[in-house]
Each structure stands twice: as C-alpha cells, then as structure tokens.
Amino acid sequence: MSKDKRKYSSEIVDGVEQAPSRAMLRAVGFESEDFAKPQVGIASTWSMVTPCNMHIDKLADAAANGANSVGSKPVIFNTITVSDGISMGTKGMRYSLVSREVIADSIETVVGGQGFDGLITLGGCDKNMPACVMAMARLNRPSIFVYGGSIKPGTNRTDIVSVFEAVGQHSEGSISDIELLDIESTAIPGPGSCGGMYTANTMASAIEALGMSLPNSSAQEAVSQAKLKDSHRAGEAIMNLISNDIKPRDIMTKEAFENAIAVVIALGGSTNAVLHLLGIAHEAKVDLSLDDFERIGKRTPVLADLRPSGNFLMSELIEIGGIVPLMKIMLEKELIDGNQITVTGKTIEANLNEYGHYPEDQTIVTKVDKPIKADSHLRILYGNLAPKGAVAKISGKEGLKFQGMAKVYNSEEDAMAGILSNKISAGDVLVIRYEGPRGAPGMREMLSPTSAIMGKGLGDKVAFLTDGRFSGGTHGFVVGHITPEAFDGGPIALIQDGDLISIDAETNQINLNLSEDDLARRKDSWVCPVKDEEGGVLDKYRSLVTSASEGAVTTKK
C-alpha cells in the first residue's frame, strides 16, 4: 500500500534500519503483510473505575475488528478515566477536569510516539469525550470518536441524580434510611454513562453535531447491539478518512462548532459543554469565545424535554430515534449548517437524508414553533461580579431574575455543611468560591450542594454562584465559571455575607450591588486564603491552566 496512506507508520516500519521496530511489533501480533497496512491506534478508556467505562473494552474490540476488515492494522491502547459520580463532593473531584488534560496528553503521546496513521477513540465518562477530541485536534490525523453509550434507567426511572437528591431528602427527613438505601441500590443498573442530558450525553451529542462521530453514535445504549455495530462501523470508516486524507481540522471548522453549540442548546444540555467546546476549539485552532454561545443562543430554542431540567431520560430519546431527527428539524429550520463535512466523508445534510423523522405521537422533542424555551437556557452573563464572563443554566422554570443576600463559603465542603445544617434559606444567594481552575485546583463540580438544596425543596428559592463548575445533572438557578476566579482576586473573592446580588438572565447581567469605590477598597485589603501545596499533577495544572472563559486549557495557542 502506498506511503500516502502510511504517512506516519512508514517511518516506523519501512527499511532495513527499522528491523528492530518490526521485531517488537511482531511480538504483539503483527504479521509480515501488516507492515504494508495503515496503522490505526484505538484509544480505549476501559476501566473498572466507573460503570461509564466498564464495557468499553468490548467496543474497542469491535472497532478493531472493523478496522481489520477494511485492510488497516488496529492497535488498541488504554488511557485513564476519573469518575465524577464517585468523586463528587470530595477532594478527589479536583482531579476530574485535570483528567481531561491527562487523557488528551496521553493519547497524543502514544499516537505521536507510535506513528499511527489514523485514530479511533472511545469514551464514556464526562471528561473522556472532550479529552479524546482535543487529542484528535492536536494530532490532526484521520480520526473518529465513538461514544460508549448511555446507561439504562434504574428502578422507577431513577438515575445518579436521583441518589444525590435523595441525600437532601434524607437530611430534610422526608425519606428514611431504608428508602435512601433502596434508591442507592437500584439507581445504577449496569454499564453506561449517566442517563439524562447530563455532561456525557451532552458532549457525545455535541461531538456528533461537530461531525467527529458517526450519525446516531451519541444515542445508543451502552449495552446494545446498536453500540457494538456503531463501534465496528467506526473501524470500517477510518480507512475512508485515511484514503482521502480527511483530518479533524478539516471537519472541525468554526461553522461546525456553531452547529455543535446549537444542538447542545436544543437538547437543553450541560453548562460543561461551554468549557469543553472552548477547549476543543483551542486545540483545533478555531477562534471560539463565550460571545459565540450568546450569539447562537439568541436564535436557538430549547426543544428537548430531557433531564435534569425536563422529564425524560436519554434511553427514552433513543427509543424515538436519538438526535438525528432533531438535527433534521434544525436543518430544515436553518438552525444548523448542513454543508459541513463529517467523519463519513459526507456532509451533515447528506447524512441526515438517510434518516427519518420522529414518530408523530412522541412528546419528548417539541416543534420549533412551540419550544420549551424560545432561546438558550445557557446564558453568558457579564457584570461587576464577572467582568470576563460567567455561564448560567436557566431553563426559565426558575424565573429569569433573582435578587438575594449572599451566603458565602470558601469551599464546597463548608457550603455542604451549611446546607445540611439548615443555614440556607429561601431568597439566599449561595456563593461557593475558591473552586476555580486554579483555586481548587481543578474546578470542581457542585452537584452535591445543588442536589442537597433540591432535596430540601429549595431548588426554585435559592440561587447558586461559583467560580467552579456545575454538573450536567444540576438544575435550578445556577451561575458558574465566574471569571476572574477568586484565587486570582476576581470580584467573587470580595463578596461578604449579606451583600445584595442581582442576576438578570434577560439582560445577561450579574452584579454585586456595591460601588466601584467599595469594591476597590475591598480589593486593597483582600488576601488570598492559604491553599495547600498539593504537589504533583495538581500543582502542575495550577501553574499552566487558563481561565474558564478560555476553556481551562493547559496548552498554548
């Protein structure tokens, strides 16, 4: 086979001088004829750390079989994962966003070092998805992403968020120890990613809309023949990308990112999509900013009635056809650009033409002229509390404005203790700070406190502010990613208990009701609380990471 299809592997295996390389490869299963084939790296995030990833080894095998069937030589390798659901609410959660960078770095390292001509990545837990695609963008070799798939519902349509909210219900006394144990024991029935339009399903959908996975890859259950077939088809499809030299940056254009943003909004997806799409765009050399989310949000309605803000699970969306019919609706209404190329080698429009519409009697996805919300639930806020931006998730059910007195905590643990000891009341603005990319370090998610508030029945009566993140499972009046963060002396560091805070999702403003002079006086006397010297990867991350408004990345432009 020509060197054009073996642009990288030919340097590893061709010629007398590469006999040692070939000798090593023979030991891992290469035959003489395999050296003439394009080599395809298959990056598996298989792990028994989390149910999100416990089945991915089987999907990696299916992808390898597909790649074998079309004349390439697959090589499976592994990378790490961290479980958000397990580490949530603990110091371990500091490593979650850090793992995005470690995964991207490790995939880049193996592919660059081994000279693979193409790349298939498989991800399950939240940070896997952006990490895999960030690595693809950096390497810019023919690549496809395969989503590990969504989990089946638990008993009585429960999921992981049901368990987090049950903690608040238990604290409030509305459920017993036995009832809590029952929810804990039956909410997670097996493999797959968390079952609402939380971060994993949001990012899988965004990547499909971006063009980096096959149609409907985002909308299959983890344990299903459909997901095994999707993985096999990805293995088959990689050869077409190699043959035609279609690379990630050919696919991930500015217009493709705009498609991904629009689909995330239509699905009612996670705030984490903002952070992750900014990070992917950074690696793809695409100029994307918070203002693009605001601009696209003004013209894009929320159409899907999915958890956490809505009623339905991902498994129920899968039953009616996944996100492909949604994208058909959006294409017909000119809410996405159908001319963008995808990993099939065809345009989005050509891909969508092969699929039908939703059943007429379905109630999960609304019509464009009768949306759940006429514009985006993801609001980009600015003001004297967030001069460089913040990201709010406001479905409209909570109202569009909130004004209240601040209750300030300098860590998630302190805030959680305050909530469970009934120190938070209706009308409060709960501020959790020093949880940003540099402050935590690692920008922890605040699912434990928000779920506890929901469980106590205060979800529509309390607003949350943080320089950290919110889980895709969070709902309520929440504002995160506040920039500059407290660790860097941002205005959020200057808030005191009892300060009046105003949030307006109509004007996209977030303000502390103090004069510039008062803020300046507080800034003059501000001293950053002493943070532990963490050592290791957390210190490395703190020294490199950019702000949330820039995607919290660790590589230079």
Please report, for each region that a protein language model flagged, where it lies by residue.
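Catalytic or ion-coupling anion/metal-binding cores of large enzyme and transporter domains
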Residues: S2-M54, L59-N78, G85-I86, K91-S96, ...
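A short, small-residue-rich loop immediately preceding and capping a beta-strand
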Residues: V111-C132, I144-Y147
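Glycine-rich, highly charged phosphate/nucleotide-binding loops
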Residues: S96-D105
